[in-house]
């Protein structure tokens, strides 16, 4: 039996940096990047040379260069989702940045996409097999709470169609329905809850 291929780095353990200066490689296996480029570091096992990807090219980068000449981007997927930056979001996912990572407030990238009304971003996140729909942040809010509060009925509808839970309460004991700021969102959530209670035997 042949040996199984080595396991790839776990998604979410990829470190992301923005280069502050251009790096000119001295050997063919080193990675060229320019000031402002986003670098995805996938392997930091060698203390001197880290493996990274930039603009679809992979190569080695001196670790001390990254430490001194690049700034760390802690939650790149969240930043992309917040800004509605679709190409950066896709690049993060292509480079194995974890889709369910949490920022300091306990929010997922999906939460920020729903909060900002970025339907195209939500669409792309929905293509990720292990996406966590019902993650609650430190305030107990889910992506559904955010979409309802911001009044994005189209996104509320998308989340419900994917199976987002309507029975989760935040720290203030509020359901997404209680947070709905317009009739369209409230109506969708009410309809879903009524359908849900008819099926449960609590």
From Swiss-Prot:
Matches recorded under CDD domains: SH3_OSTF1
Segments forming domain SH3: 12-71
Example GO biological process: signal transduction
Keywords: ANK repeat, Cytoplasm, Repeat, SH3 domain
Residue spans of the ANK repeats: 72-101, 105-135, 139-168
Gene3D superfamilies, per database record: Ankyrin repeat-containing domain (1.25.40.20), SH3 Domains (2.30.30.40)
SUPFAM superfamilies: Ankyrin repeat (SSF48403), SH3-domain (SSF50044)
Cell compartments where the protein resides: Cytoplasm
PROSITE patterns documented for this protein: ANK_REP_REGION, ANK_REPEAT, SH3
A Gene Ontology cellular-component term: cytoplasm
Function summary: Induces bone resorption, acting probably through a signaling cascade which results in the secretion of factor(s) enhancing osteoclast formation and activity.
Full protein name: Osteoclast-stimulating factor 1
Biological source species: Gallus gallus (Chicken)
Gene that encodes it: OSTF1
């Amino acid at each position: 039996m042949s040996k199984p291929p080595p396991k790839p780095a776990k998604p979410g353990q990829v470190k992301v940096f923005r280069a502050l200066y251009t790096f000119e490689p001295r050997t063919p296996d080193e990675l060229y990047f320019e000031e402002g480029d986003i670098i995805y570091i996938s392997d930091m096992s060698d203390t001197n040379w880290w493996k990274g990807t930039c603009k679809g090219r992979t190569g080695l980068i001196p670790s001390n260069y990254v430490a001194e000449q690049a700034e760390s981007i802690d939650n790149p997927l969240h930043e992309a989702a917040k800004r509605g930056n679709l190409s950066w979001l896709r690049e993060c996912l292509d480079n194995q940045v974890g889709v369910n990572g949490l920022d300091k407030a306990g929010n997922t990238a999906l939460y920020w996409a729903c909060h900002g009304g970025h339907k195209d971003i939500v669409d792309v996140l929905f293509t990720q097999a292990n996406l966590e729909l019902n993650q609650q942040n430190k305030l107990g809010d889910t992506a559904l709470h955010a979409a309802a509060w911001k009044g994005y009925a189209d996104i509320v509808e998308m989340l419900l169609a994917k199976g987002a839970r309507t029975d989760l309460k935040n720290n203030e004991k509020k359901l997404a329905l209680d947070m709905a700021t317009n009739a369209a969102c409230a109506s969708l959530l009410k309809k879903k809850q009524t359908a849900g209670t008819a099926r449960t035997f609590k």
